[in-house]
């Protein structure tokens, strides 16, 4: 997506930090209301969950590396989501909550932005966050937050250039 002839990152097009904070807040509110997805939060969650989630998404979508610098790496995030067995219904409902949160946060007006954000969240939910069903101890050390651009997952050295 271009703004004044300059290519924007998905992070910028989503409204930067403020846009992703709105999205994280809207998604969190929706999942807490969903009878299936809310189970993932039934044992409590970090008091700054929304801010941390927005920082994670920001880093993945071409924004600042605040999450990795202040909170942890991909290994930590994947371990938090691992060891719970398969949960396809929960994943699909979390994605549906995300799609509704895009509307709530005002990020669904631009179809290209809506689609890329949906694709990112659906990919992350059904791959990186649900890869280790048996045990969080199976998650390898040293994982980096995957980067996502307008064209999908960014592989290799170009991940630092989005």
Where are these regions (language model features)?
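Surface/interface-facing alpha-helical segments and adjacent flexible terminal/loop regions used
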Residues: 13, 74, 141-144
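Short, contiguous alpha-helical
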Residues: 123-146
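Heme-based O2/NO sensor domains and their adjacent alpha-helical segments
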Residues: 2-8, 21-110, 114-120, 127-133, ...
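Short, Lys/Arg-rich amphipathic segments at extreme N-termini
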Residues: 8-15
